[in-house]
Amino acid sequence: MNKGQYFWNELWCEGRISFHKEEVNPDLIAYVSSLNIPAKGRVLVPLCGKSVDMLWLVRQGYHVVGIELVEKAILQFVQEHQITVRENTIGQAKQYFTDNLNLWVTDIFALNSALIEPVDAIYDRAALVALPKKLRPAYVDICLKWLKPGGSILLKTLQYNQEKVQGPPYSVSPEEIALSYQQCAKIELLKSQKRIQEPNDHLFNLGISEVNDYVWCIRKG
């Protein structure tokens, strides 16, 4: 287990998961239509944790594929929502699945890409910003390989003064987004908003009082 894997496993084991939200993300509800997902389309949720957004997407009629490093997160997800799953193990990857939900427990960078069928859309609420800068290019490449031509990504990022603190969540500038996805057909900024950090926010406790939130729709050519 490398340093990054140990870090995330420790957070889940100790219950330090302030990044997990109990409510469906309002930006997903507001902007999911911009993805133009076909009926019964496949949606990838990378670094999914136990996000309730996955359940919301399933209830909209989509097939959700989640990838998560920490098995405890997936086990909590299926237990908390009383989901009856089947199990499978392929190499180092463990799979929990139903007819419309496919959850992989593995390092996304080590997952055999052939195990993920092409998806119609990707929903990234907190995956890109969870990764240090040196890993983000590889992450983008992997996700784009899984995305069908013409498919779209709903991506949430944030930006703050990195001189004060390093993430996660990491600050990702609009310039980095433009560079990272320059091979795509369209990069559209759907939302840009300043947000004052509340005392229970992780970044507030690290000395960050204000962040810029961004929501992007990125379409693959």
Curated annotation (Swiss-Prot):
Entry annotated with the keyword Cell membrane: no
The keyword Transmembrane belongs to this UniProt entry's keyword annotation: no
GO BP annotations, alphabetical order: methylation; response to metal ion
EC number(s) reported in the record: 2.1.1.67
MF (Gene Ontology): thiopurine S-methyltransferase activity
Compartments, record wording: Cytoplasm
GO CC annotation, single: cytoplasm
Main location: cytoplasm
The organism's place on the tree of life at top rank: Bacteria
Alphabetized CDD domains for the sequence: AdoMet_MTases
Reactions mediated catalytically: S-adenosyl-L-methionine + a thiopurine = S-adenosyl-L-homocysteine + a thiopurine S-methylether
Residues that hold S-adenosyl-L-methionine according to the record: W12, L47, E68, R125
Keywords: Cytoplasm, Methyltransferase, S-adenosyl-L-methionine, Transferase
SUPFAM superfamilies membership: S-adenosyl-L-methionine-dependent methyltransferases (SSF53335)
InterPro entries: SAM-dependent_MTases_sf, Thiopur_S-MeTfrase_Se/Te_detox, Thiopurine_S-MeTrfase, TPMT
Similarity-based family: Belongs to the class I-like SAM-binding methyltransferase superfamily. TPMT family.
HAMAP family reported for this sequence: Thiopur_methtran
Protein name in the entry: Thiopurine S-methyltransferase
